Each structure stands twice: as structure tokens, then as C-alpha cells.
Amino acid sequence: RELPNYQVFDERRYFVSGREAGLGPVVVDVLGWRVGLLVCEDAWFDEPALAAQSLGAQALVVINASPFHAGKRGEREARMGDRARSLGLPLVYAHLTGGQDEVVFDGASFAVDAHGAVAARAASFADETLQVTLLPGGAVQGAVAQPLSDEAEIWAALVCGVRDYVGKNGFPGAIIGLSGGIDSALVLAIAVDALGADKVRTVMMPSPYTADISW
């Protein structure tokens, strides 16, 4: 129903929104539940979810590829919690994990109950299957993974981005120039975590300011 077309998004180059195509919301029957299906931007606006509820949706499922930035997981859970609470419906949010060129997706799929509380969560930056059970009255049951610390989350994003960029492009590894400074040392540490030490080679490229200890 809604198409993002800003920043890294260019959806209108490839798609026409369901609204423009004259298509209504998608509500399907799954194991005795009427489930409203939202895609990406749909979940951030009121109308798509309200339209699904008007067709009898008892729960919402959101499929999404939402680019990572610091604090995004918390923003996402808060926004979807507000959506679920305003409608009185449980919501399950299935999210992409991995890197695609310069964009990184952090996973951490989750479910909130009809009161907007997080009731299930998958791990960040990990390929996982999150199993949730929808119960009468809008309750949700499932495992809740603990979120990463801010520092660990940033590190995981950097490692994920490098690993998938190298792997998806079919590169055999990486060669890194070291100056002796902390910046290139940090790049080396990220590369080793992402690819393994056997796939990383270094070349010392000192400057007049490189200290002897760097050797």
C-alpha cells in the first residue's frame, strides 16, 4: 500500500503501490486466524493496518527489510508496539538479516502482543527461525533474545557488512594496508572477525609519522 522512495529506497522505479493499482489490503486465513499482511513501509502508516483490520484481521504480519542504524531496533519495536496497541492486535515482524552492498540489515525479528509489549525476539545479526504462538485475547508466546549492547551492535553491523560484501561478490579475501595507526588496525580487526585470519593479508605502508612500535 505504501512505497518508500527516499534515502536508500527507490521502490517506485520497480513497483506500483497496491493503492495505485486498485488493490485492497491482503488478509488471509492461517490456522484459524485472519492475518493481515503488511510489507515494509505499510507498517509505518495508519491506513494499511486499519484497512486490514476492517477486513477482519485478528493479527498482523509485517515482512520487512529495514536498514540498520544505531538505535534502529529500539525505534522499530517502539513503533510497532504503538501500532499493535492502537489496534488491539498482536503483530509479528519478520526482518531481513545480512548485508547488501552498503546497506546492512540487523535481523532481530520480533513479535508484540496486543498491548504493544515485546513478547518474542530473535537475535540481532544472526540467521534464526523465531517461533511464536498467538493466543486468544492478543497474547503472544515466544523466546526473547537479549539485545546487544550499543558497542556490540555497531561491531556486529560492521562485521556483517564486510562479510556479506566480500562473500556475495565472490572475492577470495581482502588485502589491507596498515599505517600503524588505530584506524587501519581497527579495519584489520573487523576484516579478521568477518572473514577469518586465513583470508586477510596485510601490507605495511608507513608514513613519516609511523612510530617504531608499529613495526
Task: Give the role of each language-model region.
Residues 184:
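Catalytic nucleophile loop
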Residues 90, 205-208:
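Short, proline-centered helix/strand-breaking motifs
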Residues 181:
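Conserved G/P- and acidic residue-centered "switch" motifs that form tight phosphate/ATP-binding loops
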Residues 202:
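Short beta-strand "acidic-cap" motif of Rossmann-like dinucleotide-binding folds
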Residues 1-177, 188-199, 212:
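Enzyme catalytic cores with a strong preference for nitrogen-chemistry domains
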